[in-house]
Each structure stands twice: as structure tokens, then as C-alpha cells.
A protein has these predicted regions:
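Secondary-structure boundary motif
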Residues: 48-55, 84-88, 114
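Residues at or immediately flanking beta-strands
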Residues: 57-61, 91-93, 120-122
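Helix-adjacent hinge/juxtasegments
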Residues: 49-59, 65, 70
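Short, aliphatic-rich beta-strand segments
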Residues: 22-28
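A short, well-ordered alpha-helical element
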Residues: 12-15, 31-56, 75
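Amphipathic alpha-helical interaction surfaces in cytosolic regulatory modules
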Residues: 37, 42, 62-112
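N-terminal amphipathic/basic leader segments beginning at the initiator methionine
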Residues: 1-17
Length: 128
């Protein structure tokens, strides 16, 4: 799998797909004008990786300051794909980073974590 880096814009997060190191990072704000065009290739790349090497596992770091409902759906698709792969025996860890005073993002992290059964989901608060 080819590693990829997508620089952040004012509406799209920084995305690091470092499959060779079994690592993905999403950082910034996520409310792209065309959510399908932005998230689709990322989700497809992840699913291709999981098809090739799901047993290897992966770490996903999410440090989003804001996301819209379309991005929430894409995030759920990503998390579900990782959870399904974890069910097959891979070691998958999701780290959800949010600022300690951002209760909304903490609650989103809690809601996402409740929908997963097999992947490890950690919520970490960051000091401002």
C-alpha cells in the first residue's frame, strides 16, 4: 500500500495514511464541501489495506476540533471497518484526542467508542 499525506485546508483535516508503519492520523477540522469526494478515497485506501493485511493491525489517531454530520458518518465508516478487522484478530487501536475543556468532542468520542466491540478505543484529553 502506498502511504499518503493530505495537507489540511480551512475545511479539511490533515490526513496521514502511513500504512507501512500501520498508522493513520486525522487532525484539524472536517467539514469538506464534498464529503464523499474527500472521505471516499481515504475509506477506500483503508479498506484496501485491510483486505491485504488486516491481521497486522493499525493505530488511528483522531484529533479533530470540529466535524460536520457528513464527516461523522465517514468517521463511523472508518471506525466500523477497523472494528470488523479487529474482530478477525488484528490489533487495532483508536486514540481520540480532544481538548480538556471541549465537552462536545469528548462526548462524540464516547458515542463512537460505544459502537465498537473489538477495536481498542481510548479518549485522551489535551491541556490547552
Amino acid at each position: 500500500m502506498e502511504d499518503r499525506f493530505i495537507a489540511a485546508t480551512d475545511r479539511e483535516p490533515e490526513v496521514t495514511l502511513h500504512f507501512s508503519k500501520r498508522y493513520i492520523s486525522l487532525k484539524g477540522e472536517a467539514y469538506p464541501e464534498d464529503a464523499a469526494a474527500f472521505w471516499g478515497p481515504i475509506i477506500n485506501a483503508l479498506k484496501n489495506y485491510l483486505t491485504l493485511d488486516a491481521q497486522a493491525g493499525l493505530t488511528l489517531d483522531i484529533e479533530l476540533l470540529y466535524f460536520n454530520s457528513s464527516s461523522a458518518k465517514a468517521l463511523m465508516n472508518i471506525l466500523n471497518a477497523l472494528d470488523e478487522a479487529a474482530q478477525q484478530g488484528g490489533d487495532f487501536c483508536i486514540n481520540w484526542y480532544c481538548q480538556e475543556e471541549d465537552e462536545t468532542m469528548q462526548e462524540f468520542g464516547e458515542e463512537f467508542s460505544e459502537s465498537l466491540q473489538y477495536a481498542i478505543f481510548k479518549i485522551e484529553t489535551l491541556a490547552i
